[in-house]
């Protein structure tokens, strides 16, 4: 193990244990730092004190040249800067090659959303009369009905369901718990999945010693993965003409449709689990068709 590899491990442990960052965030930082170490290794750099500002700038340029999105490049730079800052603070390194490197502002893109009609078509389509079909319907209803992140959905345990009170207890980013209200249609889909035996049928495939507390199970009776949720969204989206449907698109659509329906921005911030209301404000965009309609209806010379 090289010195830099050991340093990266210590930093990731710090993020996980002392900073209490979510497993998904730590995993993303791990991937970024592995790419960073591999890039430096090709240059013969194996220790933190040998890293120069030029090395870091070239790594960023390399990531951009590989086609990484601005947000991904900025996250990688944040991981690298955090690593070197940590090493200096801990007395492991005496050089701080990233001190003069500023993180560029990422271009804000409006989130991809589907229309209300498309959402209804997605959720009202006939689902297979199987345990997996009942599960898939519930997955889509909860994603759109509660605005959950995919990691929040897959992390749900049965004890987190408070269906009589009509809310879910969700573990969000930074291990912060919040209450998420649930729609009537999502409640009915969950009831069909849970009370009518679909989950029990999937649970029957699990090994006796490996009974899972998860709400959503795969064909082996274990917790449904993020990748499986992605596949569910793509498959059922495609059947109603929505190509490349992503779980986060349903979260974006939930937020956009809630605001269009008159939801308060602060309330929506709480439901979505955003630490900063500026993150929620991106959903205040209005599509061009609606903008034109409002303009024509309101302007005296239109």
PLM region spans:
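Conserved catalytic core of the tyrosine transesterase superfamily
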Residues: 1-302
């Amino acid at each position: 193990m090289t010195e830099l590899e050991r340093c990266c491990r210590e930093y990731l442990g710090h993020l996980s244990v002392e900073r209490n960052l979510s497993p998904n965030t730590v995993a993303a930082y791990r991937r970024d730092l592995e790419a960073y170490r591999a890039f430096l290794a090709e240059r013969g750099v194996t220790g933190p004190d040998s890293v120069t500002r030029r090395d870091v700038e070239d790594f960023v340029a390399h990531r951009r040249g590989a086609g990484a999105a601005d947000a991904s490049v900025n996250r990688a730079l944040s991981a690298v800067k955090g690593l070197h800052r940590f090493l200096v603070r801990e007395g492991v390194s005496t050089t701080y090659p990233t001190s003069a490197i500023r993180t560029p502002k990422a271009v804000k893109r409006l989130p991809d959303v589907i229309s209300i009609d498309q959402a209804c078509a997605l959720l009202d389509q006939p689902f297979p009369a199987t345990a997996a079909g009942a599960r898939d319907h519930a997955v889509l209803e909860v994603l759109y009905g509660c605005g959950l992140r995919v990691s929040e959905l897959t992390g749900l345990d049965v004890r987190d369901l408070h269906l009589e009170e009509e809310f879910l207890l969700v573990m969000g980013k930074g291990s912060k718990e919040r209450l998420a209200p649930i729609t009537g249609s999502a409640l009915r889909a969950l009831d069909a999945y849970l009370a009518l035996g679909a989950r029990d049928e999937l649970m029957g495939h699990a090994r006796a010693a490996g009974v899972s507390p998860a709400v959503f199970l795969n064909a082996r009776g274990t917790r449904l993965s993020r990748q499986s949720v992605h596949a569910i969204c793509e498959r059922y989206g495609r059947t109603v003409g929505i190509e490349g449907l992503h779980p986060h698109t349903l979260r974006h659509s939930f937020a956009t449709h809630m605001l269009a329906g008159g939801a308060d921005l602060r309330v929506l911030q709480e439901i979505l689990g955003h630490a900063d209301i500026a993150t929620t404000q991106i959903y205040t965009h209005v599509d061009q068709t609606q903008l034109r309609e409002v303009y024509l209806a309101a302007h005296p010379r239109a």
